[in-house]
Structures are given as C-alpha cells and as structure tokens.
Amino acid sequence: MDHLKRQDEKVFAAIEAELGRQRSKIELIASENFVSEAVMEAQGSVLTNKYAEGYPGKRYYGGCEHVDVVEDIARDRVKEIFGAEHVNVQPHSGAQANMAVYFTILEQGDTVLGMNLSHGGHLTHGSPVNFSGVQYNFVEYGVDADSHRINYDDVLAKAKEHKPKLIVAGASAYPRVIDFKRFREIADEVGAYLMVDMAHIAGLVAAGLHPNPVPHAHFVTTTTHKTLRGPRGGMILCEEQFAKQIDKSIFPGIQGGPLMHVIAAKAVAFGEALQDDFKTYAQNIINNANRLAEGLQKEGLTLVSGGTDNHLILIDVRNLEITGKVAEHVLDEVGITVNKNTIPFETASPFVTSGVRIGTAAVTSRGFSLEEMDEIASLIAYTLKNHENEAALEEARKRVEALTSKFPMYPNL
C-alpha cells in the first residue's frame, strides 16, 4: 500500500491498525471471516472505476464488455455451487437481497411469517425497527422453550392462523440445522411463498455439509462473506419464473450501478468454493465448532440448544452473573473478539443482552484446529469467571498472544 501511505497517512494508519488487530486477536464473531489475498486483489482492482447499470448484454453504459464477463463468471459459478436456476449477484448486502425479494412479491401491509429476532432471526425478518417490520405485517415464530430448537408444529399452526403471503426461514443466531423441506411443506399447505435466508450457512451448504435450501425455496438470499468467505455483499437465487421480477427489483428497483469490483471479488470467492479444499475447510469449521462447544460445556458454560450443528455457538452467560455486554467487553480486553447477543426468551435490553454469539469460520481460515479450540474454550471460561481479576486477565492476554503468534495473518501485507 505504498501509494496510500504517501497519499493519506491517516487512512493508511487506520488500516494498518486494523490489520494489527486482526493479527493479534482471536476473531470469533460468527458473521466474520478472512478472505484470501486473491479476493482482496479483485476488490481493489480497476473495476472500481466502471459504471455498469443493467445486466450483462443489456447495459445502460458503453464499455462493459469486460465487466460483463466477470458478472457472468460469478453467476455461473453460483449456479454450479448451489444448483440454482437464476442468480443475481448485484445486491450490495444481504439486507438489500431480502428487500428485493419482498419488493418482488409483497404489497405494503402483507402478512409475513418470520423468526423472532431474539430467538435467532434477523433484523430484516420483521424487526419493528427495520423496514421489514414497518412495511409489512410480520408474525413471529420461535424456538421451543426447552430444546431451543424450531418448533415446526408451531410454525404450521401460526401459518394456518395468519395465512402469510410469505414465510421466511433462516437465522442469524440459530446453531442447529434448519429443515427447509418441512418449511416448504408448511408454505405449500397455506399457499405461501418460501424465502430462505442462508447468509450464515451458505459456505456449509456449498460444501454439502448443510441441507441445500435451493430445491425447496422459491427464493434464497445470502451474504457472500461469513462461511462463504467472500467479500462483503449479497446475492439472490431463485426459480426461473421469478428471474425477471427479481432482476427488476434490484435494478432499477432499489439499486443503481453495481459494484463491479466487489462482483469480481465475489466471482473469485465462488471459484474458491468450488475447489476440493473448500469442502475440507467447511468440515473443519464444523469440527472446530463442535469441539469448542464441548470444551465450553466442560468448563460449566451454558449453551443455547445444548450445542451446535454448524459454525455458530450461542452462550447464555446468566449463570455467571454477568451480561452479554460485560462478556463482550472483557473478552475483547484480553484479545478475543465476540459480540453480545440476545438469547431465546430474552429479558434484557438488546444493548445489554444475556448472551454471547461466537463462530469458528474465521479462526478456521486462520488455521486453528481442535487443539486450539480446547485452549479457546479454556480462555473464554477463565476470562468470564475472572472478569474482575486484573491479574487473571493479564494472564489471559498472554495466552491469547501465545496462540495468535503461532498463526501469522496475511504475512505479505
């Protein structure tokens, strides 16, 4: 980054500081990952200069012959990975992908059935502070009070009662496998569309390690980062019958020019996801998550649903007599990055919470394996149990430093 350093020392310094943070801390935020240098090179390419409103072969600007190739590569690779009939890779985010689906099939005030945010859903699945909850009449389903797993009988009962036009499946904090086939059966029984938001699990689906929602859903949305390990962005997969409507909802509906440099980075990441070593990577994510969950439970920590089937673990910290906010802060103080998170049947404020959400996608990209999961479980428990003991926290910091120093990050940057 020699040019940046010469041109803007302040921005350069901030980026260097962030690189230092990523190198020195243990990244456990479930929605984050570390992209390859090839993905970063594509995103930092000259494609950032090109306006390309429209779609390949039908642009509103000249000079799009090369970016057309890039977008076609991205779309074709997604079709190969997931078996989708139609793909739109232009959404700038998962939220915009969800918005485009809603705009395609819903009218203002239509009823939608989505997962309660504190039970593991997402802001765009009907939260009253989000456009989805403002524009549409969302009815919530959730998890069982004892098992903390989706109660499909309850979903069916609510669907029969409220007759939604759309059912939304998928989550941002649900550590168990979702039965997409069952969701489609429920949707068909009440005459609803089914949209699956697979943002968190897309990489696991790509590797064949989680059921694929594409054969069951009318629409599938996802981010391109998280377990898929691409740049930050979104995309939509849908049945061919909705292709023109979805494309129109993205452009000119809610976006103008696509970010072609980001689409190039998406294409590179999709190419990586087609390789055999990506399947190994995804399996290691799950293996690490299971080992970490086991370690946390051995340390006496309480896990929502009692464990995990994917990359994500939700810790209920109430038995430690602390809040999620305190847990996030003290873990960050010793070099472990997590996020506070609501838990099912939450009683605390979303700014405080009773839980912490963690995931293994980023640490697995870094090369951590089962042995490191044992140490991380020990570190988390030790830190939370001694959150007011400065000597203990200093010891935890040294253990984190010893661990991260074994796995250098981005040595060429």
UniProtKB/Swiss-Prot annotation:
<keyword id="KW-0554">One-carbon metabolism</keyword>
<dbReference type="GO" id="GO:0004372">
    <property type="term" value="F:glycine hydroxymethyltransferase activity"/>
</dbReference>
<comment type="similarity">
    <text>Belongs to the SHMT family.</text>
</comment>
<feature type="binding site">
    <location>
        <begin position="121"/>
        <end position="123"/>
    </location>
    <ligand>
        <name>(6S)-5,6,7,8-tetrahydrofolate</name>
    </ligand>
</feature>
<dbReference type="GO" id="GO:0019264">
    <property type="term" value="P:glycine biosynthetic process from serine"/>
</dbReference>
<dbReference type="InterPro" id="IPR015422">
    <property type="entry name" value="PyrdxlP-dep_Trfase_small"/>
</dbReference>
<feature type="binding site">
    <location>
        <position position="117"/>
    </location>
    <ligand>
        <name>(6S)-5,6,7,8-tetrahydrofolate</name>
    </ligand>
</feature>
<feature type="site" description="Plays an important role in substrate specificity">
    <location>
        <position position="225"/>
    </location>
</feature>
<dbReference type="InterPro" id="IPR049943">
    <property type="entry name" value="Ser_HO-MeTrfase-like"/>
</dbReference>
<keyword id="KW-0808">Transferase</keyword>
<feature type="binding site">
    <location>
        <position position="239"/>
    </location>
    <ligand>
        <name>(6S)-5,6,7,8-tetrahydrofolate</name>
    </ligand>
</feature>
<dbReference type="Pfam" id="PF00464">
    <property type="entry name" value="SHMT"/>
</dbReference>
<protein>
    <recommendedName>
        <fullName>Serine hydroxymethyltransferase</fullName>
        <ecNumber>2.1.2.1</ecNumber>
    </recommendedName>
</protein>
<keyword id="KW-0028">Amino-acid biosynthesis</keyword>
<keyword id="KW-0663">Pyridoxal phosphate</keyword>
<dbReference type="InterPro" id="IPR001085">
    <property type="entry name" value="Ser_HO-MeTrfase"/>
</dbReference>
<dbReference type="InterPro" id="IPR015421">
    <property type="entry name" value="PyrdxlP-dep_Trfase_major"/>
</dbReference>
<feature type="modified residue" description="N6-(pyridoxal phosphate)lysine">
    <location>
        <position position="226"/>
    </location>
</feature>
<dbReference type="GO" id="GO:0035999">
    <property type="term" value="P:tetrahydrofolate interconversion"/>
</dbReference>
<comment type="pathway">
    <text>One-carbon metabolism; tetrahydrofolate interconversion.</text>
</comment>
<dbReference type="InterPro" id="IPR015424">
    <property type="entry name" value="PyrdxlP-dep_Trfase"/>
</dbReference>
<dbReference type="GO" id="GO:0030170">
    <property type="term" value="F:pyridoxal phosphate binding"/>
</dbReference>
<comment type="pathway">
    <text>Amino-acid biosynthesis; glycine biosynthesis; glycine from L-serine: step 1/1.</text>
</comment>
<comment type="function">
    <text>Catalyzes the reversible interconversion of serine and glycine with tetrahydrofolate (THF) serving as the one-carbon carrier. This reaction serves as the major source of one-carbon groups required for the biosynthesis of purines, thymidylate, methionine, and other important biomolecules. Also exhibits THF-independent aldolase activity toward beta-hydroxyamino acids, producing glycine and aldehydes, via a retro-aldol mechanism.</text>
</comment>
<dbReference type="InterPro" id="IPR019798">
    <property type="entry name" value="Ser_HO-MeTrfase_PLP_BS"/>
</dbReference>
<feature type="binding site">
    <location>
        <begin position="349"/>
        <end position="351"/>
    </location>
    <ligand>
        <name>(6S)-5,6,7,8-tetrahydrofolate</name>
    </ligand>
</feature>
<dbReference type="GO" id="GO:0005829">
    <property type="term" value="C:cytosol"/>
</dbReference>
<keyword id="KW-0963">Cytoplasm</keyword>
<dbReference type="InterPro" id="IPR039429">
    <property type="entry name" value="SHMT-like_dom"/>
</dbReference>
<comment type="subunit">
    <text>Homodimer.</text>
</comment>
